[in-house]
Amino acid sequence: MSRRQTCSLLLIAFGLFYLVPLSNHGLWIPDETRYAQISQAMLLGGDWVSPHFLGLRYFEKPVAGYWMIALGQAVFGENLFGVRIASVVATALSVLLAYLLARRLWRDPRTSLACALLYASFGLIAGQSGYANLDPQFTFWVNLSLVALWHALDARSRRARLLGWTLLGLACGMGFLTKGFLAWLLPVLVALPYMLWQRRWRELLGYGALAVLAALLVCLPWALAVHAREADYWRFFFWHEHIRRFAGEDAQHSRPWWFYLPLLAVSCLPWSGLLPSALRQAWHERRQAPVVFLALWLLLPLAFFSLSRGKLPTYIMPCLLPLALLMGHALVQRLRLGNSVALRGNGLLNLGLALLALAALAYLQLRKPVYQEEPFELFLVLLVIGAWAAAGLAQWRYPLRAWAAPLLASWVLIALLPAAMPNHVVQNKTPDLFVAEHLDELTGARHLLSNDLGAASALAWRLRRSDVTLYDTRGELKYGLSYPEHSQRSVPLADIRQWLWRARQDGSVAVLLRINSASDRYQLALLPGDGERYRNGNLVLAILPQVRP
């Protein structure tokens, strides 16, 4: 197949598997609705400096990630595609970086293509590409910073070296504006030991200053602007989002130190069977500069994230590009040698996982059905399992010819699985679809009330309003609600009837509740019995008409 044919086929696959599904399912709570609402508020209100969630100060992240999601909504509309396109673009750019870095390291087109394809089809990378959060963007900036570092170190001219270090600084600056100080730490974790090993520490000191200057030029304008606007921003952001999350006893998402070790293997699916041979080859080539650089990039950030108390699966996404390159390099070496053992093992693993998934689905459907009168969704999930099994079988039977078969498994999974979700999951996790069904009833509401931040942000995004009052909940908006001018934005359980009486004198009130527990049912029971009610799964929408004083 010619290069033009390969590129055309990959572009078609990108559109079919990555772009088309973006508009086919609602926004998942809590992340997608939160980021959609924050960025929409920037777009509508014009405040591009201080992040606000539901009109309240929200200082958990800087602003660049919100800017990109807002840009997507500005260009493509305030819709599902517009909210998610930033993640797809960031992922596509990271795939391009994988290709370019592999080409620079090994100067072999086949290896470059294999590395890019593996990275694009890693389960965690492909799955997050259609999900509106900040991790794909942050991962791109970290990837760019370290690719720029290698280009600077491998440069043959002073001009190219200067460009590489400058690009490193710019990428660190944008990474910082996306997710914070980690964007500075991760490149240092790799650059410092590598350049000491290379005995190039003077170059690190000299050109590193240029990178720091470039990063500061990117960061300082916003850093000073947000400090002038919100004097408490940096205290909260540094201590709450960095120190407490890394070392605090009450850190969010606390996990054991070994949490990321099995997750790393799972993140590589459907290529996890190649992991042992890739690591073994990396050990044999441990004195080669490219392998040392990639190993440091993989292992040192992984160790840092493992030491942190707060852990989420997406935190290790910056570790996956070097792993894809090590695996792609090992894969092509085995193809050239005609060694099919690892490929057969990978195919057998995927086939086994597909059969296990099929058996689990059959068991659940017989004992406690996951899909109830949902033949289309059940057909889609069977199609996903079938594609995974077919890819595994093909790679097992014809490992040297069908080495790329796992691409099909991964891409069919990300394209169809969101649409294959059971209705009870969709109803619970994507409340914006329920809100969209009742826009006519909601448009005239004077006040909005919700007992759940995910539902509240879905309501706010669909109605293009930030003034949703919180009903007996605070969550991650506890800090924003602590400001005196916003104390009335949350109503405790004991005051709800009085609040509703006063609010209904101004106009109608729309109440969106998620009912997941006995306390939620009690919240629903406290609402007046008049007005219209609509229910979908565990979501209840009550439209309470205006009352006279």
From Swiss-Prot:
This is Undecaprenyl phosphate-alpha-4-amino-4-deoxy-L-arabinose arabinosyl transferase. It is found in: Cell inner membrane. It is a multi-pass membrane protein. It catalyses: 4-amino-4-deoxy-alpha-L-arabinopyranosyl di-trans,octa-cis-undecaprenyl phosphate + lipid IVA = lipid IIA + di-trans,octa-cis-undecaprenyl phosphate. Keywords: Cell inner membrane, Cell membrane, Glycosyltransferase, Lipid A biosynthesis, Lipid biosynthesis, Lipid metabolism, Lipopolysaccharide biosynthesis, Membrane, Transferase, Transmembrane, Transmembrane helix. Pathway: Lipopolysaccharide metabolism; 4-amino-4-deoxy-beta-L-arabinose-lipid A biosynthesis. Pfam families: PMT. InterPro entries: ArnT_tfrase (IPR022839), Glyco_trans_39/83 (IPR003342), LipidA_mod_glycosyltrf_83 (IPR050297). It comes from Pseudomonas aeruginosa (strain LESB58). Belongs to the glycosyltransferase 83 family.
